[in-house]
């Protein structure tokens, strides 16, 4: 993606054009990771229900995904729902899952149009069947895309990933003496992808 590519799709004289002209396209990160946090605080500051904060967060996801794809970012990972999030009220968790399903239904065509490949990282097998179905459909339909890799971390925990990676390594029959950082990375959810260059917590 070049400056001219960006300028061809943003309105002349717009804030987007001004911002694009400030970007160093030669120094863009290969992998951006975003920890989605603060939706509740955003809503509280505006005296709105927490659900409105989550809805606003979904809108931000749309902008981040499309913007990253237009910039030519190779990998975008959104940490959306951690294993600790199950401790939230049942109604809030249900709302989050409903918003996730709605996003996937509404944005699948956008992912396809922008050649974005979708992948879930985390313990997706522990999610509700209807949620797993939507996630699987999005993965299947975008599997042949060759543009940006879009990972969404659901029911994810860093320690849980390390434990699962260790189990997969042991199951593979690898000699412990041969296991180094590079070989271990082959058992992570993001195997074959570059490590994040930029981590943003919202």
Where do the model's predicted regions map?
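Flexible, compositionally biased loop and terminal segments
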Residues: 1-202
């Amino acid at each position: 993606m070049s400056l001219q590519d960006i300028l061809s799709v943003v309105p002349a004289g717009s804030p987007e054009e001004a911002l694009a002209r400030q970007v160093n396209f030669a120094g863009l990160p290969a992998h951006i990771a975003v920890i989605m946090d603060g939706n509740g605080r955003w809503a509280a500051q505006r005296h709105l229900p927490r659900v409105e904060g989550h809805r606003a967060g979904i809108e931000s996801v749309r902008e981040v995904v499309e913007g990253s794809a237009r910039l030519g970012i190779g990998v975008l990972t959104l940490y959306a729902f951690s294993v600790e999030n199950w401790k939230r009220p049942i109604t809030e968790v249900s709302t989050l899952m409903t918003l996730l399903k709605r996003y996937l239904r509404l944005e699948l065509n956008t992912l396809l149009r922008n050649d974005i490949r979708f992948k879930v990282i985390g313990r997706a097998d522990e999610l509700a069947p209807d949620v797993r179905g939507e996630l699987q459909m999005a993965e299947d339909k975008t599997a042949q895309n060759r543009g940006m890799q879009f990972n969404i971390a659901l029911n994810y925990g860093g320690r849980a990933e390390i434990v699962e990676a260790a189990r997969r390594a042991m199951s593979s029959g690898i000699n412990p003496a041969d296991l180094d950082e590079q070989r271990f990375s082959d058992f992570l959810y993001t195997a074959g992808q570059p490590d994040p260059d930029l981590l943003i917590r919202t």
